[in-house]
Amino acid sequence: MQKPQTIFEKIWENHMVHEEEGKPSLLYIDQHLVHEVTSPQAFEGLRLNNRKVRRPDLTFATMDHNVPTVNRESFKDEISKKQMDALKKNCEEFGIKLADMYHPDQGIVHVIGPQLGLTQPGKTIVCGDSHTSTHGAFGALAFGIGTSEVEHVLATQTIWQDKPKTLNVKVIGELGIGVTAKDLILAIIAKFGVQFGTGYVMEYTGESIRKMSMEERMTICNMSIEAGARAGLISPDQTTVDYLRGREMVPKGEAYDTLAAEWLQLATDEDAVYDDTVTIHANEIEPQVTWGTNPGMCVPISSSTPSIEKASYPDEVERALEYMGLTENQLMTSIEVDHVFIGSCTNSRLSDLKKAAAIVKGKKVKAGIRAMVVPGSFLVKQKAEEIGLDQVFMDAGFEWRNSGCSMCLGMNDDIVPAGGRCASTSNRNFEGRQGNGARTHLVSPEMAAAAAIEGHFVDVRSYASVPS
């Protein structure tokens, strides 16, 4: 009788090409996602060594990090334009399908992969981007890689990897009304720290996880890297199967049903043993707001910034408070914002936009605040416009943009000015992440929307229109 296995062990075993004890293992890669920032040097390496892309059919490229979200022809700088031109040239030369910024499949790479059905349970997926962990929501082993590894995968369709350990993040109970997947993952990182997942693949289990939609699960797995993990995983179930049915890149009819049955067998076996387990109680979690300069510097909205004297790392806390322009023991509800960004690979999908729109409908953005909504893909934008979400946001005073990474990172036209304070639905609040000197507070789409209306952070649960 075979030993019970976790989903990670099953996928790893299925993709093992070569292993030696004490050395990295060689894994086969099922899907390689490429964007314009981390790929130019990789393609140049292929040219210098006279190599081809081994499996262009298993490689898919898009433009997302640098794309302008207002005027597609207006670039922040020459480097951004050169990177996008290089990707177009490289994809043409090496025979790779590209969704450029005018293509109907264009979008943030971690939004369009699932949207197209490229992301599937049991696959190994890599991309030159740390938030590749997003795809783990489908029961895929997905992780970010560096530029030299991008070249290796392009050339060989394999990658050398040290085998991580397994960590069960067990979520007990259910989330309360107005508390979101974003709040859950922020609370997990705040409780256990930004390094507790180092050396592990984290699998999320429990009642709350099972009740989540696929888009909520993507938010959870997206931020696994912020806990230090190599990847995040959620075992596939009927929710996964229903989401992928009919997607462009999956089989149809009986072939899909056969494949779906195989996917469901990938779920972690009942008696499988993890290397470690942590637990968190969902019903104790409130809407969250980060106060500092990493995602672990996060507290409930009803709380305040920490006391420097009582902090475990007082120097770190003092520096973060100084950079953020905050004082110790300051109520989170007293923090005013001047920018609001709803977007990024964490929270730019249709369900995210629907929830934010429910908060702002019939209201107005506070005077002096610049608020923008940036859909995660061309298709998300199209679907949102079909149901009138664009008009809801624009009537409230939000800017309605084209798809792209946008204000998540200071790499394109959409930046927060020095000293500006942004309520952001993105995943990183490092110093200068949204622009030189910018101050970032990570929140859910609902919390960001409420901050835009009120001008400061509020407990979104006080809004009668909070979706259940």
Swiss-Prot record:
GO terms for molecular function: 3-isopropylmalate dehydratase activity; 4 iron, 4 sulfur cluster binding; metal ion binding. It comes from the Bacteria. The keyword Magnesium does not apply. The keyword Amino-acid biosynthesis applies. [4Fe-4S] cluster binds at C345, C405, C408. Pathway: Amino-acid biosynthesis; L-leucine biosynthesis; L-leucine from 3-methyl-2-oxobutanoate: step 2/4. It catalyses: (2R,3S)-3-isopropylmalate = (2S)-2-isopropylmalate. Gene3D superfamilies: Aconitase, domain 3. Its cofactor is [4Fe-4S] cluster. Binds 1 [4Fe-4S] cluster per subunit. Keywords: 4Fe-4S, Amino-acid biosynthesis, Branched-chain amino acid biosynthesis, Iron, Iron-sulfur, Leucine biosynthesis, Lyase, Metal-binding. Its EC number is 4.2.1.33. One of its GO terms (biological process) is L-leucine biosynthetic process. Belongs to the aconitase/IPM isomerase family. LeuC type 1 subfamily. Catalyzes the isomerization between 2-isopropylmalate and 3-isopropylmalate, via the formation of 2-isopropylmaleate. Heterodimer of LeuC and LeuD. This is 3-isopropylmalate dehydratase large subunit. It comes from Oceanobacillus iheyensis (strain DSM 14371 / CIP 107618 / JCM 11309 / KCTC 3954 / HTE831). The lineage of its organism: Bacteria, Bacillati, Bacillota, Bacilli, Bacillales. The gene is leuC.
